[in-house]
Amino acid sequence: MLIEYLIRITVMVITSERLLILMGLCDESFHFPVMIRVVFNAAVAIVIALVMSKLYKVLFAPLDLRRKLEDVGYVHHDHSVSREENIRDTQRRKKLGNTPPVFPNGWFKVADSTWIKKGQVKSIYFFGEQLALFRNKRGLLRALDAYCPHLLANMAAGGKVVNSDCLECPFHGWKFSGETGKLVDVPYAQKVPTFVSVKKWSCCEVDGMAYLWYHCDGGEPKWVLPSSVTINTLKYAGKTEHIINSHIQDIPENAADISHLDHLHKPVIGSDVEKTNESLLNNLIFHSIQASWKPPTDPNEPHRSTMSIKDNIHLSIFNIKIPLLYLEFEIDQIGPGAVHIHVRTPFFRGLMLQNVTPIEPFVQKLTHSFYVSPWVPVCIAKAFYLLETTQIERDILMWNNKTYFRQPVLVKEESALAKHRRWYQQFYSENSPRMNHRGDLVYPGKPKLADW
């Protein structure tokens, strides 16, 4: 409001002085009092600063795009109800079908490494669990179940890192080892009960991101999450974040759904699937995509699969195709949640690090971090990746509004999709949590907590 007020004063000062001179009510030497001139100059300075700030963000600042659940991926045809009501109805009416377990086993991104400093405690919520993520005094990342087994206070809400590597509950000061999760101190007790502990989650940090290992049966990680081989030769260009209402398997399964690429992703611009054909540009310029998905070839790395995409962007006039741009994407899926996407264009090389993490059943957090050749201007990189983001948001519309069935109707040309489903089954186990027919989350083999 203050900035808007100053801008109005600026316009008023300029127009009023000139108007009085033109009307002959004062001569060319006329000026408003000094105080008004000071306000005018301050307003001009603020406007210039705002313009320069906007220009800097567009030209030089990395992309930082965050979409909430309600921002993208829903249709709103019935305007007699609000958009929020429409989204709730879509979620409520979604048929669950015979779905796989809701949380696969593997590594999942939970934060950027820079988000949590040495000695800090952060509250995070993933896999339907409240967790305490903290960095100990030596800089090592730790994660524990957030609820103290004493009186179930949330240790991530006011808890502190103490004794180099312990999390202290803010309620009564009970201290738990970040390395083991065991209770190590009760400040007012003569003897510490040795059988008390909280669940400790395995952590790692790769490419500037913090990951947790999820497994329904606990235990140590089954594989090491690798760093991207090209990231150290590229520069950071930004990131996007989307919250999605779907089963987690829908998202990586997209890689093996080859037939959708040349249909859903054929138009070059726009994330609104219902309006992409209204654009003149989309009726002239098209993607022509060839792709293949392959299961793992290395028996020592069954958790990895690959995909290759060749994308010819062409201008079509009277059915004559004129090539405009050729793109290649080499995609490495690592477990159920991490993907390295290597981008080749005629002008630069790029990298997208995609991560999908379950927040709770049928709610996923999808992030993309972007990197490009060092000499590429950030504004060019942002434009390229924003176009890629519009393609992702078309998929989100499909994911948010579809359901999942174990045995869909497939034609023989979709054999890769069936192979992908068989490959992905390795990330579920007998005790993986599931949704029952009433929509309740069930943990097989895990006793229910008794009401107190």
Swiss-Prot record:
Give the Enzyme Commission number.
1.14.19.21
Q: Which cofactor does it need?
A: [2Fe-2S] cluster
InterPro entries named among the record's database cross-references: Cholesterol_7-desaturase, KshA-like_C, Rieske_2Fe-2S, Rieske_2Fe-2S_sf
Q: Where is the Rieske domain?
A: 107-212
Under catalytic activity, the entry for this protein gives: cholesterol + NADPH + O2 + H(+) = 7-dehydrocholesterol + NADP(+) + 2 H2O; cholesterol + NADH + O2 + H(+) = 7-dehydrocholesterol + NAD(+) + 2 H2O
Q: Name one GO molecular function term.
A: cholesterol 7-desaturase (NAD(P)H) activity
Q: In which pathway does it act?
A: Steroid hormone biosynthesis; dafachronic acid biosynthesis
Membrane topology classification: Multi-pass membrane protein
Q: Extract the Gene3D superfamilies matched here.
A: Naphthalene 1,2-dioxygenase Alpha Subunit, Chain A, domain 1, Rieske [2Fe-2S] iron-sulphur domain
Q: Name one GO biological process term.
A: cholesterol metabolic process
Keyword tags: 2Fe-2S, Cholesterol metabolism, Iron, Iron-sulfur, Lipid metabolism, Membrane, Metal-binding, Oxidoreductase, Steroid metabolism, Sterol metabolism, Transmembrane, Transmembrane helix
Q: What is the free-text note on the cofactor?
A: Binds 1 [2Fe-2S] cluster per subunit.
Main location class = membrane
Question: Mind naming one GO cellular-component term on file for this protein?
Answer: cytoplasm
Q: Which residues bind [2Fe-2S] cluster?
A: C148, H150, C169, H172
State what this protein does.
Catalyzes the production of 7-dehydrocholesterol (7-DHC or cholesta-5,7-dien-3beta-ol) by inserting a double bond (desaturating) at the C7-C8 single bond of cholesterol. Essential regulator of steroid biosynthesis as this reaction is the first step in the synthesis of the steroid hormone Delta(7)-dafachronic acid.
* PANTHER family reported in the protein's UniProt record: CHOLESTEROL 7-DESATURASE NVD, IRON-SULFUR DOMAIN CONTAINING PROTEIN
Q: Report what the protein is called.
A: Cholesterol 7-desaturase nvd 2
Q: Which organism is it from?
A: Ciona intestinalis
Q: Which gene encodes it?
A: nvd-Ci-2
